[in-house]
Every structure is written in C-alpha cells, then in structure tokens.
Amino acid sequence: MEKFTKTILLRDGTGVCIRPIEKEDGPALLSFFRALPEDDRLFLKEDVTNKDVINRWMEELNFDKVIAIVAEKDSAIIGDATLHLSQRGWHKHMAEIRCVVSREFQQKGLGTALMRELVAHAVEKRILKLSATMMDTQKSAQRAFERIGFKKEAELKDFVMDINGKYHNMVIMVNDVSELWKKMEDLLHYYDIRTMH
C-alpha cells in the first residue's frame, strides 16, 4: 500500500492526521485501546488490551489482506479503522469494515473520515460490497452505519460472545460501495471535514 499522510480538520476545528498503520505503532495502539472505556472494548473481537494480541497484529501486518489506518493527534492514536479483504472465491468482491474512535473524538466526523479513506481503498481494489458485523446490543454502532447507508441483512441468534463470556446475537450490515461513496461525500460536507493535504 502506498504511504500517505492526510491532515484533516474535524467539525470542531481540531487538526488530525490520518495515515496507514506501521509496525512501530504497536505501543501507541495498545495505549489507545487500553484508554477506551470498557463499554467500548466489550464488543471488540479480540482482547485489545493484551500486548500479545497487538504484537501479533503488528507482526502479521499485510496490506494485501487488511488495510489498516489510524488517526493521530499530538503523536497519540485516537482512531483505528480496518478494511478486511476476502481476496478469493465467491467473496473476493467483498470486504469487512471496522472502526474504533476515542470517545473524546466521537460525534465530530472522525469515524466518517476514517471510513471514507477505507471506502476509497475499496474502490481502488474493485470491492463492490462492504459488510460490518456487530452485536445486537451495539445500537449506536448500528445507527452510525445506518447513517452512511448500511442496511441490516441478517441477525444470527446467540452467535457471538463478548469478552465477559456473554452470548449476543450477531448483526450483519451491508452496503454497495458505489452508494456508500456518495453518502460519505455528503456526510463529510455535513460535518465540514476538510482535508488540508
């Protein structure tokens, strides 16, 4: 993946840098996840407070499989977003998108800006459909994806388990990349997100 760095202005005028993740980001990424409130971490797929998990991610970093970007302010990571590519078979036109933003920077357009960057990469990779999976109790995440045009396609009963061992239904949401691109442009205009360079 070609290296890039973009500085954007959020809705409140805060300048934030968006760039691809690097192997050296392990400690900063771990600090980011450990600083998240437990409610925000409860529904993540792995124990992101575990140093070994983050180290494994950094060792296995491969942008042909997972496009991973971060948002940074004052050298601290404040957002993490990934696009998981299927690559082969009947799913090769699909990818899964995930995004986590520090609570302090939620509702300011940062999540939308991160997802827009990943959608741009999806277009480059000729991805036609994006999916997002979450637990049924993650209502705010569902609303966030609905705002950018994702639709709930399925709900699988007691399909996933949170980090406390409790079962939840898994919600699968889907969107066409072409429709999503237009929606992202509209949302960035709404949030008044400006790319500086």
Task: Describe each PLM feature range.
Residues 115, 122-134, 144:
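Conserved GNAT acetyl-CoA-binding A-motif
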Residues 26, 31-45:
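Helix-loop element at the rim of GNAT/NAT acetyltransferase active sites that forms part
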Residues 15-28:
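A short beta-loop-alpha structural element at the N-terminal edge
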Residues 131-134, 146, 151-168:
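Conserved catalytic-core motifs of GNAT/GCN5-like acyltransferases
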Residues 46-93, 98, 102, 176-178:
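Acetyl-CoA-dependent GNAT
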Residues 14-16, 74-80, 168:
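Glycine-rich phosphate/pyrophosphate-binding loop shared by adenosine-nucleotide-utilizing enzymes
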